[in-house]
Amino acid sequence: MARTTPLERYRNFGIMAHIDAGKTTTTERILFYTGVTHKIGEVHEGTTVMDWMEQERERGITITSAATTAFWRDHRLNIIDTPGHVDFTIEVERSLRVLDGACAVFDAVQGVQPQSETVWRQADKYEVPRICFINKMDRVGADYFHAVDTIREKLGARPLPLHVPIGAEDKFRGMVDLLKMKGITFDDETMGAKYQEVEIPADLAAQAKEYRAKLEETVAEIDDELMAKYLDGKPLSNDELMRGIRRGTLEMKFFPVLCGTAFKNKGVQQILDAVVDFLPSPVDIPAMKGVDAKGNDVVRKTSDAEPFSALAFKIMNDPFVGNLTFFRVYSGRLEAGSYVYNSTKDKKERIGRLLQMHANKREEIKEVYAGDIAAAVGLRASTTGDTLCAEDAPVILERMEFPEPVIHIAIEPKTKGDQDKMGVALQRLQMEDPSFRVHTDEETGQTIIGGMGELHLEILVDRMFREFKVEANVGKPQVAYRETITRTVEAEGRYIRQTGGRGQYGHCWLRLHPQEPGKGFEFENAIVGGVIPKEFISPIQKGIEEAMTSGVLAGYPMVDLKVELFDGSYHDVDSSEMAFKIAGSMGFKEGAAKASPVLLEPIMAVEVTTPDDYMGDVIGDLNSRRGKIHAMNPRAGVQVIEAHVPLAEMFGYATDLRSKTQGRATYSMQFAHYAQVPASIAETIVTKAKGVAAGAK
């Protein structure tokens, strides 16, 4: 089967935003207008196509990125709807990794919100060109130009307004298109599917003219030819402007901004036009870089003629077909039933079937080409971030990195019968979600699950019950504390057992240095003159790393320190790898205890939006939680309070905030950094941790 759509007409893009900015609604409208669905799904009715997991429909939030294919103006759109809740940031990171462009949706009342900043930074990291959609123009307090300003102020980005709204709040009727210099209004009878171009309303004529002039000036800046024409006072033609906007968007010099209200069906077709006109096709993005089996750099161009290469970016367990592996094809082509080589795991796997996904409906296809996003059935070993490629042309594309959990919960099956099922369920969920970790506490024997927040773990436990019929009891959330050292010390590790027969001899001197926060662990071999033979250096490092998993204060992992191995001795006969590993571990423990160890805790960046009347209560409450308030901004009748608060103090905050503000305040939080725990509180934590450890023995 030959390719039906040329590569230049592909658009792989994601819809990204803060929770509640209206991403899923926008996607639903896109599916409606592109003719994929015949009835619009509503989030508040729980009938959306993209939010197909049961919990998503109940909670009205998007958890997994559903991938959908649609068509507009003879272009093939592969759309990925991403979650906006901070606990699911990993999903956003995964989808951005495989997208070429994105549409960032903002709330016209709030403008840029905290999660919008996080997602925007992730898109910057992967250099994803974006267009912006200011949604919810029909809401009370909607202010398009304020929202545009927040893109400039909070994201440090350069917005390029292509629209001026006609009316706002309940008077919002449409927008002025600054390229065509026409007004656009929508028919309510056809659910916005039909719209008219009208003359620009007289009261907006001056403003439209002003913004058109700004548009021409901004676009002219990126092209010498256009700049010369602009400086000569000649007007730029629409074609020239379109070309310039496309170029500036692809180079991320600026970000086109549109407006509308997806819920009221106004402005969605304009998003689709902008996706086609301004976002990149797979041909416009740089060739994919990777390494071959020998570690040499390899480049894969976006072409069907190149060897096959793809990146698995999501694993999902489907009740009907089992494991689905979502992947993005970067080069070459692949037929259903053929074999692929997983170069990350060094395994050959057979692709059973290939599916084109439309949210949770699927269409079987025979072949995929460069630029496609599809799902494969039958891959057993592949997990998120793995490279799939042709066996005769192996390549490893750059891997994704996933954050460490900030919260842990003990979990146990309700009955003996649930025991085995729980193990299988946790393993499956871990395959799907790399930011979800499972381990067994060696001292207590409990199963501990870790994730990015309370909601994250709550939903995973809920999925265990719904999808795997496993009932489990869940403990209280535990904070992922860490330990570190605060001064440089030297320590000796001696492990010498010489009593008849072959003995054990390991001896080393270590220097421990504190590192700046977030720097991690560093090991330096400063041995000179072979006082310790080369083959024993690695065991010493291994011993140190094992000792670091259980700190000297309360048994929490140690971070942000450097260990320098600078002296020691060995015995010709009695020295062994094991002896030096034990010596390394002993030396580290002794040094860490002397190096003024301290406890670290995760600090969260919290943003609370509250009506003015409750501001005092909210601030007082944050202060009582050891919060540090660092900004307060008035915004459309509400106050936005930004603070840093220890995670340990944030459990149950949602309920407290609701009761303090009669449910009128909202908040969002995300991990900011680790910081030292105050001495008085650290003492309690250490005593408690030691008590638990003693009780387990």
UniProtKB/Swiss-Prot annotation:
Keywords: Cytoplasm, Elongation factor, GTP-binding, Nucleotide-binding, Protein biosynthesis
Positions of GTP binding: 17-24, 81-85, 135-138
UniProt similarity note: Belongs to the TRAFAC class translation factor GTPase superfamily. Classic translation factor GTPase family. EF-G/EF-2 subfamily.
HAMAP family according to UniProt: EF_G_EF_2_B
Position of the signal peptide: none
Compartments where found: Cytoplasm
SUPFAM superfamilies with a match to the protein in the record: EF-G C-terminal domain-like, P-loop containing nucleoside triphosphate hydrolases, Ribosomal protein S5 domain 2-like, Translation proteins
The tr-type G domain, residue ranges: 8-283
GO molecular function: GTP binding; GTPase activity; translation elongation factor activity
Name of the protein described by the UniProt record: Elongation factor G 1
GO CC, alphabetical: cytoplasm
Coiled coil: none
Function as written in the Swiss-Prot or TrEMBL entry: Catalyzes the GTP-dependent ribosomal translocation step during translation elongation. During this step, the ribosome changes from the pre-translocational (PRE) to the post-translocational (POST) state as the newly formed A-site-bound peptidyl-tRNA and P-site-bound deacylated tRNA move to the P and E sites, respectively. Catalyzes the coordinated movement of the two tRNA molecules, the mRNA and conformational changes in the ribosome.
Single GO BP term: ribosome disassembly
Entry annotated with the keyword ATP-binding: no
